[in-house]
């Protein structure tokens, strides 16, 4: 007795709906789509204002350790553009991400939230 050859199932005809979906793009949306034009904003403290039109701001980030649950505090220093040189050391400021204005500057001063005493 000879084994019967398995026949491949006939291909289904493409429907109009699937053709439209292929033309528009993927059928699902990526989980976290990056919205164009959204810029990061951060709040930090000015630690240096000795450069012309530039301030150094210390940004603090608090992250919970995944295993032990301890809150870990990390800091990062960034340079920000201060057009009128109005911010001073110790001021609490709001920054916004921007296009690179120099080799190391990618942030700009939005407003001074609290002046140093």
Swiss-Prot record:
Task: Give the Gene Ontology MF terms in alphabetical order.
Answer: rRNA binding; structural constituent of ribosome
The superkingdom of the source organism is Bacteria
User: Which residue spans adopt a coiled-coil conformation according to this UniProt entry?
Assistant: none
Give the record's GO biological process terms. Answer: translation
Query: What cellular-component terms does GO give this entry?
Result: cytosolic small ribosomal subunit
- The family this protein is said to belong to: Belongs to the universal ribosomal protein uS17 family.
Name by which UniProt lists this protein: Small ribosomal subunit protein uS17
Organism, by scientific name, is Mycolicibacterium paratuberculosis (strain ATCC BAA-968 / K-10)
């Amino acid at each position: 007795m000879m084994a019967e050859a398995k026949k491949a199932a006939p291909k289904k005809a493409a429907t109009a709906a699937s053709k439209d979906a292929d033309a528009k793009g993927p059928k699902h949306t990526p989980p976290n789509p990056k919205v164009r034009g959204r810029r990061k904003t951060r709040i930090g403290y000015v630690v240096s204002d000795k450069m012309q039109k530039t301030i150094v701001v210390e940004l603090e980030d608090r992250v919970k350790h995944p295993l032990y649950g301890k809150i870990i505090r990390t800091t990062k220093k960034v340079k920000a553009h201060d057009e009128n040189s109005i911010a001073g050391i110790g001021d609490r400021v709001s920054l916004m991400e921007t296009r690179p204005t120099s080799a190391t500057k990618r942030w700009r001063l939005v407003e001074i939230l609290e002046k140093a005493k």
